[in-house]
Swiss-Prot record:
Homodimer. Pathway: Pyrimidine metabolism; UMP biosynthesis via de novo pathway; UMP from orotate: step 2/2. It is an enzyme of class 4 (lyase). The keyword Ubl conjugation does not apply. Coiled coil: none annotated. The gene is pyrF. GO terms for cellular component: cytosol. It comes from Pseudoalteromonas translucida (strain TAC 125). This is Orotidine 5'-phosphate decarboxylase.
């Protein structure tokens, strides 16, 4: 169904000017995409900005990648749920107990609870960078390992590159959501993402949600680019 397909795009808002962000967002329809707010914007503008986006009708992915002791992370995801966000994430490398307690903290919110997603391996990390951290696995092996841990802890899915999506779907099941950054529409610059695919390639590989930032936010006609992306994955 095209509507469901169109809601697979999560636009990464990376602005240091709140009005510029709102001017951009107001060009979009909540039926055509969801929005991702990360550390930069949240640090600048805080929960009030997130609530404003929600009031405009958008589902918001609060991308703060919580990573702390279990009690602190549980309180943080509770605060995110009270804010009304659609999705929130934590670092899988925080461990099983941290992830499990975060999921338990969302239980009282019932069907209003945000999806809880784990970050596995950042898309800017390659094998060389992992080795510098003392991890001897390849990026793909580490993603699979951490994704299995996240599922065991009860999480709803993971952030992963499209290259891992097919294997993750096969091993962890269709209901385990895969959120994929590093997506570049055909003809876009790769930027600082080392593991990239086009939207259609990522969906075909098994990704459920695609994070796209600069190729849309910095486009001359962002609405047209978004429409093209949505059409490409119908």
């Amino acid at each position: 169904m095209p509507f469901e397909k169109s809601k697979k795009i999560l636009i990464a808002l990376d602005y240091d000017d709140q009005q510029a962000a709102l001017d951009f967002v107001k060009q979009l329809s909540p039926d055509s995409c969801r929005l991702k707010v990360g550390k930069e914007m949240f640090t600048y503008f805080g929960p009030a900005f997130v609530k404003e986006l929600i009031d405009l009708g958008f589902d918001v992915f609060l991308d703060l990648k919580f990573h702390d002791i279990p009690n602190t992370v549980a309180k943080a995801v509770t605060a995110a749920a009270k804010m009304g966000v659609w999705m929130v994430n934590v670092h899988a490398s925080g461990g099983f107990e941290m992830m499990s307690k975060a999921k338990q903290a969302l239980a009282p919110f019932g069907d209003k609870a945000p999806l809880l997603i784990a970050v596995t391996v950042l898309t800017s990390m390659d094998e060389t960078e992992l080795k510098r951290l003392g991890v001897e696995k390849t990026p793909q092996e580490q993603v699979i390992y951490l994704a299995k841990l996240a599922k065991e802890a009860g999480l709803d899915g993971v952030v992963c590159s499209a290259q891992e999506a097919q294997q993750l779907k096969a091993e962890l099941g269709a209901g385990f959501k895969l959120v994929t950054p590093g997506i570049r529409p055909v003809g876009s610059d790769a930027g600082d993402q080392k593991r990239i695919m086009t939207p259609k390639q990522a969906i075909d590989a098994g990704s459920d949600y695609l994070v796209i930032g600069r190729p849309i936010t910095q486009a001359d006609n962002p609405v047209a680019v978004l429409a093209d992306v949505n059409k490409s994955i119908e």
